[in-house]
Amino acid sequence: MAHKKGVGSSRNGRDSQAKRLGVKRFGGQFVKAGNILVRQRGTKFHPGANVGVGSDYTLFALIDGIVKFERKDKQRLKVSVYPVIEPAQ
């Protein structure tokens, strides 16, 4: 038998809430202006054409269109939104 009662410390028992970061709209998806594309800490993804940056580095679409993930240079990725070109009738 244990001679000490198992006691938790008051220093335990804290855990931060998950922040739900990551890509919210993937390449090839249609988005509307204002849709959030990526939630991130810092600029893991950089803004490309027709993409704005929030104060917390959130990337969002400035126009309706199709999302495209592309290389900015060897290390950096950028996210762009291109308008949908409808065929002439």
Curated annotation (Swiss-Prot):
GO biological process, alphabetically ordered: translation
Name of the protein: Large ribosomal subunit protein bL27
InterPro entries per record: Ribosomal_bL27, Ribosomal_bL27_CS
Keyword Ribonucleoprotein found: yes
Gene: rpmA
Gene3D superfamilies: 2.40.50.100
One family name in Pfam for this protein: Ribosomal_L27
GO molecular function: structural constituent of ribosome
UniProt record similarity statement: Belongs to the bacterial ribosomal protein bL27 family.
Gene source species: Thermodesulfovibrio yellowstonii (strain ATCC 51303 / DSM 11347 / YP87)
Keyword Secreted found: no
Key words of the record: Ribonucleoprotein, Ribosomal protein
A Gene Ontology cellular-component term: cytosolic large ribosomal subunit
